[in-house]
């Protein structure tokens, strides 16, 4: 358990409207269902509330922002400082205008694809198969099926650590493979995306194809965090893992998925340490077998056990 600093913080922020909780368990907020508590979990009411909070939060207190926890391992001892979780009520709106889609950071990627399809906007179908939020997509340059966030983003909305509301264009995002280099200097609050006019039947067919592929090759009904490692240039991480003999390998309650080797799963009783140790074991075996250093795609946060 961490020291309770919420009373002091609330006294410094009399106009705060969001919810602030001390020592709040984070495991229920992640897809792996593992990990310790946040010293403080803050859910802002809206963008103005978030900006107010950050302006008044002492600079020495660390912060981390999470969405639905679909690409995340929270370590067993939890996180000191403040974890900010953007909720759909204040950050989940999705609207369309011509060939553009405006989405809050808490909007599910799948919902953005559906909104685009309803407006006959093509090019965003790949979001239909990504199990996260737009905030995470901006943070990670999320992609699937040959498309990435950088391909469709016009601009992102964000709040800086100092509490300034800013707009960042595509170039300013400094996109890399599965990363936006501008983070963690900002917290993304939404984005504007541009697609193209397309026939509704073609859009729906593409979305069905994306969903069918995902259900066929990924363990979507397991406690998992999505793709564990980035694909090395010109190679597939899952093929390297399989060739190293790691399909089905276990550490405690964690297992390399039999269905897709680049997915780790919590079989029911795993700890965060089990999952991270399994991932590091996979990395070591692939390095030994193929000479390739796999890089984590899943984010790992919190104190080491």
Curated annotation (Swiss-Prot):
Q: Which Gene3D superfamilies match?
A: 3.30.465.10, UDP-N-acetylenolpyruvoylglucosamine reductase, C-terminal domain (3.90.78.10), Uridine Diphospho-n-acetylenolpyruvylglucosamine Reductase, domain 2 (3.30.43.10)
> What are the record keywords, sorted?
Cell cycle, Cell division, Cell shape, Cell wall biogenesis/degradation, Cytoplasm, FAD, Flavoprotein, NADP, Oxidoreductase, Peptidoglycan synthesis
Main site of residence? Answer: cytoplasm
Q: Does the entry feature the keyword Flavoprotein, yes or no?
A: yes
Required cofactor names: FAD
The kind of enzyme this is, by top-level EC class, is: oxidoreductase
Tell me its EC number(s), please.
Answer: 1.3.1.98
Q: What is the official name of this protein in its record? A: UDP-N-acetylenolpyruvoylglucosamine reductase
Taxonomy of origin reads: Bacteria, Pseudomonadati, Pseudomonadota, Alphaproteobacteria, Hyphomicrobiales
